[in-house]
Amino acid sequence: MDDLSEFFVIEEMFISEPSVAGMKPSTSKTTHSPPPEEPTAPFVNDNLPNPEDEPTIGDLNAFHSGEELHRQRSELARANYEKARPEMIANQRAVTAHLFNRYTEDEERKRVEQQKNKEAMNASTSAPTSSRNGGQSVENRKRRNDVVVAPPTSEEEWKRAQQQHWMGQQQPQMQFQMQQQYHSQQQQYIMMQQQHHHMTGMQQIHHQMPSTSSADSIRSVPTPASSMHQPSPAEMRNGCGMSRNATMDMTCSPMSGGQPIVDENNLAVPEGEWFDKLALAVAEQYNVDTILGPDTYDTFLAELDFSSSESPTKQSPMEMNGDRMPSTAPPPAQNPQHIAQLQQQQNKMRLMQQQQQEMQRIEQQRRQQIMQQQQQQQQQEHQRQQMLLQQQQQQQQMQQHHQMNGGGQFATQAHQQAAYMQQMQRMEQIRHQQQQAQQHQQAQQQHQQQAQHHQMGYGIPNGYPQQMHMHPPAYGAHHMPQPTAFANIN
């Protein structure tokens, strides 16, 4: 029985032995996997991807769904484009036809004017030639060459004014020359007209263009403002120059094909009613969720609410007075003065709000700055106290050391040690500076030498690594044979 118990005890000891602290099985990874070695040859590719990191087929589903969505969207866009395209083409065709018609009209008008000029010239020359004067015929010939330069038509004057305005906008330095040129041309025309009248014996010819009188030439250079909305004479003739603002959508040009053609001539500044309609349209389409949000549009919304709540209050006292106002009658239109006053009030309110916000912002900034300054002062104070504490502790330690080492000589020894350390630091700094200067000089020398080598052709790369040629060779001043690219001739 004792033997058995002894056997069990021994067994127990053997079993529990590995759980002793020294024999615990190691969990560290380094004992199992040795550190990865550097590859011996440079062309061994160690960076192969881990096949377990590859994406699975299921990961592609999201990608494919995205592609499909994109394809559907592009198909939709294509269909929309196909729908809209014929209309776009038709619009372009209308514009092109309009331009072409204008061009042909211009050509026709030019031709007619040339014809008129010829007729006028013939009429003016036919009268005096009956008196067969030699000198007069010379005069006639001279003047005939002059009159070919026709006086400017109203159309040309309008075009010149517009062109002058545009040129002045583009290059300001050109404007003065243009004006000078225009003045001189006007003077020429006046001279020609006077000469013409004189020659024809003051008889007025029916065909000739309206003369440029001195009264006209006073306002010869139109200002940009006047020429901006000035309708062209062609449109004045067609009778659409004046009635612009009433019928914006009905334009007079016959080639517009029922489509409104708006250019710089029939473009009118919109009146107040137009603005009201626009405000209504904006308010109808306004949606809090989609557009910027309530905070930006708060003022506009408040104004809208204010104006809408005001109209019933205006109506109510009239209704309470008596039944003479039927309930179905439209609310009375506010007079423009009242509207202007309202707008002024709103503008004042808005300005005051902005000023208040600005004041609050400045106040906040000032508070923040004061807080920051206080924090900085506290931090500095804290640092100062800590420094004082450290100094006190060091002094205490010194005193303790002094007491332990038994007085006398330690104070002088500490002083000596400090002086020695300072001296060492100074020496180190000087050595460092010298070293830097030397390195700089060497680098400069090396640079010059490299440039020389390149000139002489030594700098051409051969397969060998670059040598540092300029370092002073080792072992005293003896020239040790260095391995060079060429045969060593020393």
UniProtKB/Swiss-Prot annotation:
SUPFAM superfamilies (alphabetical): Lag-3 N-terminal region (SSF158851)
Domain of life here? Eukaryota
List locations, semicolon-separated. Answer: Nucleus
- Describe tissue expression: Expressed in the progenitor zone and the early pachytene region of the hermaphrodite gonad.
- For the keyword Secreted, the answer is no
One of its Pfam families is: Activator_LAG-3
Q: Outline what the protein does.
A: glp-1/Notch and lin-12/Notch proteins promote signaling by recruiting lag-3 to target promoters, where it functions as a transcriptional activator, probably as part of a complex with a Notch intracellular domain (NICD) and the transcription regulator lag-1. Involved in the p53-mediated germ-cell apoptotic response to DNA damage, perhaps acting as a transcriptional activator. May regulate phosphatase lip-1 mRNA transcription downstream of glp-1.
Assembly notes: Component of a complex consisting of at least a lin-12/Notch intracellular domain (NICD), lag-1, and lag-3. Interacts with a NICD of lin-12/Notch or glp-1/Notch; the interactions are direct.
The name of this protein is: Protein lag-3
What species is given as this protein's source? Caenorhabditis elegans
